[in-house]
């Protein structure tokens, strides 16, 4: 609660991504928000999607919905600082989305929107290097690994 009060009364207005990072730490922007940021999906999500290690939750603040999704500790990697906010790299955002589809927590139909983005060598290498065996098998339905 104190973090929220400090954030809302900061002298310099911060971006929505910074707000999402600040309210629950550690967290990084990923999934639909990062995919939209990188131009991989056309639509801009109405919520800000973040990855955390703790319990998944949604927070509504200043007419924004912040969605925090829990991921395994070993997958809490692959993010960089962009404009003062921690964000998944393009490859990691794709990985995260596929992981949450695999877990049944995201719709599979959006994969068709970004299937061309999955074909690059850098993306394939990231998926091969970071996915466990069962996740690789699932990803193999959409990407030639």
Annotate each predicted stretch with a short phrase.
Residues 25, 36-43, 99, 103:
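Short helix-capping and hinge/turn segments at secondary-structure transitions, especially at repeat
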């Amino acid at each position: 609660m104190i973090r929220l009060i400090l954030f809302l009364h900061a002298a310099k207005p911060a971006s929505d991504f910074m707000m999402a990072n600040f309210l629950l730490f550690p967290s990084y922007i990923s999934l639909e928000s990062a995919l939209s940021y990188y131009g991989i999906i056309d639509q801009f999500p109405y919520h800000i999607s973040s990855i955390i290690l703790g319990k998944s939750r949604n927070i509504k603040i200043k007419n924004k919905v912040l969605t925090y999704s829990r991921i395994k500790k070993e997958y809490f990697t692959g993010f960089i600082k962009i404009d003062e906010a921690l964000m998944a790299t393009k490859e990691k955002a794709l990985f995260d989305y596929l992981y949450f589809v695999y877990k049944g927590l995201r719709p599979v139909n959006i994969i068709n929107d970004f299937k061309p983005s999955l074909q690059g060598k850098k993306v394939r290498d990231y998926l091969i290097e970071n996915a466990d065996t069962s996740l690789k098998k699932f990803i193999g339905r959409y990407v030639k690994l």
